[in-house]
Each structure stands twice: as C-alpha cells, then as structure tokens.
Amino acid sequence: MKRMLCGIVLVAAMACPALAQERTKSAEGAKVAITEPANGAVVTSPVTVKFAITGMELAPAGSDTANSGHHHLLIDQTLADPAAAIPADDHSKHFGKAQTEATVELKPGTHTLQLVLGDKNHIPHDPVVQSEVSTITVK
C-alpha cells in the first residue's frame, strides 16, 4: 500500500509541470504605448489615458484569437511576475473589453503609468509586450 501511494505521489509530482499554463507568444515587434497623457505631463484628475497597439490585435479577455490581447494599466507599480495573471486592483486596471482609453481617478502627486498587454487569461505574453513607464503629475 505504501509503495502504491508513493508511486501515485511521484506520478502526480511529475505531471504538475505539464499542468502549468504556457504563456501565449507575442508577435515579433509588437508594441503598446500610452499616447496620452504625455510623459512628464501635469494633469488634473480624473485623467484620461489613451492606449495604442501595433503588431498585434486587441481582443476581449477570454478571446482565443491569435496575436491578440487586451490592455492592463499599471499605476505606481511595475509588472511583478510576467508568468502570473495580472491582478485587478487599485494599481492594476484591466480593460478586458479591448478598450483603447480609460479615465482614472488619481490623487494629487507624481504617478507612474505603464501598459502591459495580457492574453485571454490576463497573463503577459512571451516576450512581454509593455510600454515605457510614463511619469505624470496630478495637480
């Protein structure tokens, strides 16, 4: 009985890497960018942020369309783990309906903004498609 149990545990442990989700490949040369506000801009809240994408298509979250994804806006943080789903919280905004702009409330002060393209499961592509970090000041 112990031998059988050890065998089952060993087989299960060996199968675990196969159960890990493989990251979606990004198209070569794909890019995302924040087109507004400009890096260094002084703005008032709420802030309208406009997104651009080249080399891939926008598709709603959950869509299994090749060479596609949807935007995630990181506010005052950087991508923690490119192999994990991007969380939805105050610092990570999901745009799973394939939106190309959003209005966000920001407190006065300096803030960083960065776009990351996520696949159908909100996981960054491989390689990661992300914008440069933009710094803005909210009056």
Question: What do the predicted segments below correspond to?
Answer:
Residues C6-A15:
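Hydrophobic helical h-region of N-terminal Sec-dependent signal peptides
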Residues C16-A20:
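Sec/Tat signal peptide C-region and signal peptidase I cleavage site
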Residues Q21-K25, G40, P46-T54, G62-K139:
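Long, low-complexity serine/threonine/glycine- and acidic-rich segments characteristic of extracellular
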Residues I34-V42:
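Short beta-strand segments of immunoglobulin-like
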